[in-house]
């Protein structure tokens, strides 16, 4: 957070509202460096795909390059979110960029001497995807550390725009480089792109990571999963992302095959197709901030989905390139419209205590659907004509966008996301081992019997709040001997985690849910905290549990 304090935002008239975060010097440097690095990564993917196309590999193998790049997120996204939450994010990025640089340099040499086999290519792509999966949540969670809170939504959108500009521009450059210099040159340029990002990270020595309460790795992972499980809004947004991505990735997976077999293009022609998509992405970077201010999130995603789907159909059916290329420009713009809008919405909505872990689930959906969509498109293209597969994908994208008319994403504006401290946990010494002991919290509400149902209806919001912030089980009871009492009981994994619920996990919206229920009690709430004590025959298990819990992630290392 120190970086925010040292960087005044430039408010000169030349800065439009959507691009205001670029006035923060370190954000501007990191943003530009990440675009360069991501451009190199997408050049790498296209180079790998074209290497297989040159060898007349099947469409399935070509599509598997995308799958090998994206699939590691399915394995490592959630642990990566925990790592990015508690370790120094700058160091995570330094480490990941260095490893990727070494892998790409090795692959460049093997390709230059003609020794790159399909197995080596796919294995290297998988390793690069694995390291990328580890760094992505840390990078996205870095944004709130370096820009003022009021610019977070715009900064999140700019980060997503940068990623998607790279996704379109990188392949375009790669196609042109392959045509002139070969695939090895593409891999070498990717290596140089990592050096750019490393240079910025080494230059940036003033980063002071935010102080986070250390948590055991397993508990931190469970907390992230529990939050997503009980956050209906986040689940709905991620599901909307999946609805678009699975069919949409047919474009990226099958474009090399369509360029060569259907359009008769060489590598340079393929590069021109990608250049058109890249041009649309650049236009989208300028159009999207304006679009977000004149249309709701659902309107932007709906329009972009329909335009993207129409672009896929035109790509295959257009009788002339004079129609194909403008359609691809619109398709690139529409891609940015969907992905950047959803990313900005998720990043702005996630509370700070679980933001990195929440973004790891976003990456899980993003890359998991990329892997599934690419592999599925490759399988279908091995059975049917690739052009028909792309047309079908375009129709599905359009229908998915139109479904927003009847099933829109939930509105998130006006929902308080700031963290507030909730009173109720006394700051007094606890017996030895109490921090690791499971806790049962029992709260007694006093309310007239005729208002009981009103309280129970209100408790639905309280239930979701408790479960999102760490409760493992929750239940409400009515005292059979005292009809005027309603009892809320929930269990938490440890006293330490229960303190976190009160001091670092409750958002303004959550506090409102709790306050609404408490206000209905006619007397002061009776709150009891019960600490679990293991029975003698469980003590061996409890000792191992305590030892494991002490293996917390040391923040800032």
Mark where each language-model region is.
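Alpha-helical transmembrane-bundle signature of multi-pass membrane transport and export proteins
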Residues: 1-412
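Short, surface-exposed ligand-recognition loops at beta-strand->loop->(often short) alpha-helix junctions
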Residues: 445-457
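Short glycine-/aliphatic-rich beta-strand segments at the starts of folded cytosolic domains
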Residues: 436-448
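An amphipathic, aromatic/His-enriched active-site/gating alpha helix that lines ligand/cofactor pockets
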Residues: 466-473, 491-527, 557
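Short, highly charged, low-complexity non-transmembrane loops/tails of multi-pass membrane proteins
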Residues: 414-430
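Short, intrinsically disordered terminal tails adjacent to the first/last structured region
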Residues: 1-12, 433-438, 457, 528-532, ...
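Short, glycine- and small/hydrophobic-rich beta-strand elements in well-ordered beta-sheets
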Residues: 463-487
């Amino acid at each position: 957070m120190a970086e925010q304090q040292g960087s005044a935002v430039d408010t000169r008239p030349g800065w439009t509202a959507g691009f205001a975060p670029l006035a923060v010097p370190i954000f501007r440097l990191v943003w530009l460096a990440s675009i360069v690095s991501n451009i190199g990564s997408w050049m790498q993917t296209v180079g790998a795909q074209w290497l297989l196309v040159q060898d007349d590999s099947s469409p399935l193998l070509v599509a598997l390059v995308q799958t090998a790049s994206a699939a590691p997120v399915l394995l490592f996204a959630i642990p990566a979110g925990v790592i990015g939450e508690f370790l120094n994010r700058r160091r995570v990025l330094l480490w990941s960029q260095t490893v990727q640089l070494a892998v790409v340099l090795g692959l460049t040499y093997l390709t230059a001497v003609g020794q790159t086999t399909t197995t080596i290519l796919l294995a290297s792509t998988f390793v690069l995807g694995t390291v990328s999966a580890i760094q992505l949540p840390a990078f996205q969670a870095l944004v709130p550390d370096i820009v003022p809170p009021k610019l977070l939504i715009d900064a999140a959108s700019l980060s997503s725009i940068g990623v998607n500009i790279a996704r379109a521009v990188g392949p375009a450059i790669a196609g042109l480089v392959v045509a002139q210099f070969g695939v090895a040159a593409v891999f070498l340029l990717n290596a140089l792109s990592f050096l750019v990002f490393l240079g910025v990270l080494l230059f940036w020595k003033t980063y002071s990571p935010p102080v986070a309460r250390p948590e055991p790795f397993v508990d931190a992972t469970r907390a992230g999963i529990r939050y997503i499980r009980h956050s209906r809004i986040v689940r709905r947004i991620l599901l909307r992302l999946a609805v678009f991505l699975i069919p949409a990735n047919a474009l990226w997976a099958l474009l090399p095959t369509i360029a060569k077999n259907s359009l008769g293009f060489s590598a340079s022609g393929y590069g021109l197709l990608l250049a058109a998509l890249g041009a649309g992405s650049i236009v989208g970077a300028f159009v999207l901030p304006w679009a977000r201010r004149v249309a709701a999130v659902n309107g932007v995603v709906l329009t972009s989905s329909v335009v993207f789907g129409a672009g896929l159909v035109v790509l295959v059916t257009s009788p002339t390139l004079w129609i194909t290329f403008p359609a691809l420009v619109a398709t690139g713009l529409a891609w940015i419209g969907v992905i950047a809008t959803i990313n900005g919405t998720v990043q702005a909505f996630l509370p700070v205590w679980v933001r990195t872990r929440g973004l790891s689930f976003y990456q899980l959906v993003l890359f998991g659907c990329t892997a599934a969509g690419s592999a599925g498109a490759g399988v279908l293209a091995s059975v049917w004509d690739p052009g028909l597969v792309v047309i079908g994908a375009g129709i599905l994208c359009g229908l998915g966008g139109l479904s927003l008319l009847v099933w829109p994403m939930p509105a998130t504006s006006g929902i308080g996301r700031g963290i507030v401290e909730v009173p109720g946990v006394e700051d007094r010494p606890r017996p030895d081992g109490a921090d690791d002991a499971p806790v049962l919290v029992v709260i007694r509400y006093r309310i007239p019997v005729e208002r009981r149902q009103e309280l129970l209806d209100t408790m639905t919001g309280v239930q979701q709040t408790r479960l999102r912030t760490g409760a493992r089980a929750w239940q409400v009871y009515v005292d059979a001997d005292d009809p005027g009492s309603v009892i809320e009981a929930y269990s938490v994994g440890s006293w330490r985690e229960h303190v976190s619920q009160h001091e670092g996990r409750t958002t303004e919206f959550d506090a409102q849910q709790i306050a609404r229920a408490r206000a209905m009690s006619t007397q002061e709430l009776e709150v009891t905290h019960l600490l679990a004590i293991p029975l003698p025959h469980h003590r061996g298990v409890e000792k191992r549990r305590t030892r494991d819990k002490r293996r917390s992630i040391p923040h800032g290392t």
